[in-house]
Amino acid sequence: ASDVYKRQVADVVNNDRSINGKLKVVFIEDYRVSNAEILFAAADVSEQISTASKEASGTGNMKFMLNGAPTLGTMDGANVEIVHEVGEENAFIFGLSSQEVINYENNGGYNPTDVYFNDWEIKRVVDQLMDGTYSNGDHNMYINLYNSLLNTQCTDKADTYFILKDFRSYADAQKRVEEAYRDEAGWAKNCLLYTSPSPRDTR
């Protein structure tokens, strides 16, 4: 997304009185190593949310891990190795597996409009792309994104990154994070697990 789109989403979230003091969107401009060092050390959770099989493996998630931030993510890239080290019960995994994504791509069987019409929260979010919520009343600003999610005007297949398919699973993972965070001792233990040598290395 362009910087303009990110700022528009931030403006909506940051001016929502219902979540004032609880949630804020901050767009980090000129992202570089010096900024990253602060973020890695300060993060409570490392969100690595690329669609399984779609993302080249990077090192950012490892740096969050070494600073004690539990992983919320898909089984993609280096997340697979992190989960292998800490145990799946100590991570917050969501979404399709790589094989499931590949099967849908090769054999079909996924229609994002089914998700859209059967999950009112997802429908509400997608509809907001067109009702001007995030674009100061401009109903056409996000039309390409809207079309790419629900029809084939922009791509050969709709929702090629399975965003709508993974969304409910992502929301459920966020709830698991919230529940785990309320257990202060358990959360601290999990954070220490992420920073310590893995059992495989200490045998």
Predicted regions and their residues:
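N-terminal Rossmann-like NAD(P)+-binding subdomain of aldehyde/semialdehyde dehydrogenases
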Residues: 2, 190-191
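Short, basic, glycine/proline-bearing loop/turn elements
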Residues: 21, 46-47
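Short acidic alpha-helix that forms the nucleotide-activated donor recognition element
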Residues: 34-42
